[in-house]
């Protein structure tokens, strides 16, 4: 039996796109800022949707959500995102002012970099990012933190330096995995009573020789 070239192409494409589960979309071309650690180019739709929302709410100019910042994907899920406003190609091409309400759908996100933007608050859904291990949001304009921040059980590195935070929720003491908390240069007026019970050496400096508080 002879097959036409069009049929061969159709069969090839159906086999290619058929590799993705229903919640994923296959991307035939990936920009240079995207790294696939493990897996193929089937990327989780909800992760892409959050990127789209981040672009839209801040009027960022990208032709594709995959162009935002530096992205690392693991088995189809977004695991690392560098979206700091560094003035170079590793971060975003303009300032982020607002985080979308659906950011909590990044449940597999492990490391998120948002330094040098103008973010003033974190959505309540932020604490639904159950896989978050390290979060860098220094040099923004944060005033408060979500009361439920203590639910981020995997978080071990939290950089809040150079913001305008006036108080820290008591729930932060529930972060049993936390080993690094940088709150240098904020407007802190008081600290939770449980702070001294956290598994951290408050008398030490960070690796750069800077104190945790100032």
Question: What residue spans do the PLM features occupy?
Answer:
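Sec-dependent N-terminal signal peptides
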Residues: 3-16
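N-terminal capping/linker segments that flank leucine-rich repeat
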Residues: 15-102, 197-199, 209-210
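Leucine-rich repeat
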Residues: 75-77, 89, 96-97, 105-109, 119-120, 127-132, 142-143, 150-155, ...
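Conserved hydrophobic beta-strand positions in leucine-rich repeat
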Residues: 79-84, 110-114, 133-137, 155-160, ...
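Consensus "Asn ladder" position of solenoid repeat domains
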Residues: 94, 117, 137-140, 160-163, ...
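Glycine-rich active-site/cofactor-binding loop and its immediate structural neighborhood
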Residues: 96-101, 105-108, 113-117
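The feature encodes a structural signal of leucine-rich repeats
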Residues: 99-104, 122-125, 145-148, 168-171, ...
């Amino acid at each position: 039996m002879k097959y036409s070239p069009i049929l061969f192409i159709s069969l090839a494409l159906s086999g290619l796109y058929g590799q993705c589960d229903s919640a994923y979309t296959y991307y035939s071309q990936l920009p240079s800022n995207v790294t696939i650690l493990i897996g193929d180019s089937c990327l989780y739709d909800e992760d892409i949707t959050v990127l789209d929302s981040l672009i839209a709410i801040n009027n960022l100019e990208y032709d594709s959500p995959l162009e935002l910042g530096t992205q690392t994907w693991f088995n189809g899920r977004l695991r690392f995102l560098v979206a700091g406003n560094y003035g170079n190609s590793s971060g975003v091409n303009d300032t982020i002012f607002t985080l979308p309400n659906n950011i909590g759908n990044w449940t597999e996100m492990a490391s998120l970099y948002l330094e040098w933007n103008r973010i003033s608050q974190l959505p309540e859904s932020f604490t639904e990012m159950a896989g978050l291990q390290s979060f860098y949001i220094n040099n923004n304009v944060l005033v408060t933190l979500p009361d439920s921040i203590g639910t981020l059980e995997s978080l071990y590195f939290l950089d809040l330096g150079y913001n305008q935070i006036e108080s820290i929720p008591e729930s932060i003491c529930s972060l049993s995995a936390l080993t690094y908390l940088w709150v240098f240069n904020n407007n802190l007026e008081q600290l939770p009573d449980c702070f001294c019970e956290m598994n951290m050496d408050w008398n030490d400096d960070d690796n750069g020789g800077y104190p945790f508080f100032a």
